[in-house]
Swiss-Prot record:
Pathway: Mycotoxin biosynthesis; sterigmatocystin biosynthesis. The keyword Hydrolase does not apply. It comes from the Eukaryota. InterPro entries: Cyt_P450, Cyt_P450_CS, Cyt_P450_E_grp-I, Cyt_P450_sf, Cytochrome_P450_monoxygenase. Transmembrane segments: none annotated. The keyword Transmembrane helix does not apply. The gene is stcB. Induction: The genes forming the sterigmatocystin biosynthesis cluster are co-regulated and induced on oatmeal porridge or the fungal isolates were grown either on oatmeal porridge or in YEC medium (0.2% yeast extract, 5.0% corn steep liquor). Expression is positively regulated by the cluster-specific transcription factor aflR that binds the palindromic sequence 5'-TCG(N5)CGA-3'found in the promoter. One of its GO terms (biological process) is sterigmatocystin biosynthetic process. It comes from Emericella nidulans (strain FGSC A4 / ATCC 38163 / CBS 112.46 / NRRL 194 / M139) (Aspergillus nidulans). This is Cytochrome P450 monooxygenase stcB.
Amino acid sequence: MISQICNEVIGLVPKKEEPGWLSVTGHPGAVYCENSISSGPEATGADVSQAIRIAYFTPLKHIPGPWYASLTGLRLSWSVFANNRIHYVHSLHQKYGPIVRIGPQEIDVADPVAGREIHRMGSGFMKAPFYELLSPGPVDNIFNFRDPKLHAARRKLYARGFTLQSLRNEWEPKVRDIIKLTVEKIKCDAVKGEAEIMGWWTLMANEIVCQLTFGGGAGIVAKGVKEPFVLMLERRMGDLAHLLKHFAPPGYYLGRALAWFIPPLQDIFYSQERMFAAGGDVVSRAREAKKAQAEPRNLFNKALEAGNLTDTDIITDAGALLLAGSDPTAISLTFLLWCVLSRPEVQKQVEAEVATLEGELTDEACERLPILNAVIDESLRLYGAAPGCMPRSPPSGGVTIGGYFIPDDTIVATQNWSLQRNPSIWDDADTFDHTRWLSNSRITDQAKLAFNPFGYGARQCLGIHLGRMEMRLAAAMFFRECVGARLGRSVTDESMHVVDSFIAGVPRDRRCAITLT
């Protein structure tokens, strides 16, 4: 019974060989109940023997960490449910060093050389099974493919649409118009009282990604309402049913049965069907645009020309691209403005620099502004939207990392929060200091290896150039149009404390207000 409670409530499932269950070893904070010492009548001698063997008689015994981490993942799981996993793991690195054991069969690495080796193309490391959770639909998507070959083939379909030159040639005018309207909305609210910038940046990013991927989302910022598909997608990824289906299938199927008699439960247990119904518009727009040869051509228009995608592939990939391209951009811009507006002297420098730009802003011109790009990079270093773990499975036969042999049944994770705040790499690591990016001598080779706010290698964020374009144009436009903006009274260091929300780091209050009054 205790093992079942651990599996169903805390976040683990039985072993792979048990039928009807999906193993999610590698879930951030997973509790390895099958490898932990149980209690009660089910705590057999074999259970205890297995837990002791893994804790003290495998190569992982040499890796430093708290004594309990070798026996149980309960403490790590608690940090996940308390939304502070990044802070907990970071505290372990501060105490035990760059390579630390955080669970019976999980380690975290905060060494930049080792991190690059883990994530480089051809390293043999694969995304951990945890990523199987991150699909809004019944098939894998561009984000959660574990097989490198499948991922490479799908990525190739979309890659040319995300090159910097392609974005500037085809999409920059549209992106600029959406950002311009967003800044106007923010300024209007701020003049009247306060503007909640995180909400506006989210709508802006939603509209840009919808437009670019499948040609939808027109008017999201103007109307102040998200695309129906986006709303269904967010509900799908955040609902109880999505987790129950993977962690406790009996509860999932019971919920679906009860939903026939309790209609409100249908929003929870039939969210996938409703998401796909809303996704019909995504498919029709993508395929119609291909026939019409619309300009600019959206991402799926180009992908359908280069390869075969089913309707399910389109909807599932659209969901993944929207999730990866909306909230992270909004979160990053929110923290960027908070960092700058908290420092009036830095704010004046940025305002003075963007004021030198004449006429309509262009991404190319913004890219040449040293102070603007320095504050962007420094905010991404400290408050990038993806500070949490990136779990990987080692190649067959195991691998040596930082002098330690790691068996192939271990989960090896890295987290940007620790790599980008490592005091042995960064001077005053926890201090916002944009000037470090204005001098090449202060960004060492180690720092270059450690700075990966958009991920590594072949798995680097597909939309890195779009994300940076949005940040440059939005920040430049904001500081040119909203000179003298101040943070709202409700904004404090505590309200902006980073909460580790599953796969993103968000402000505790999930909002940030600014004013021009």
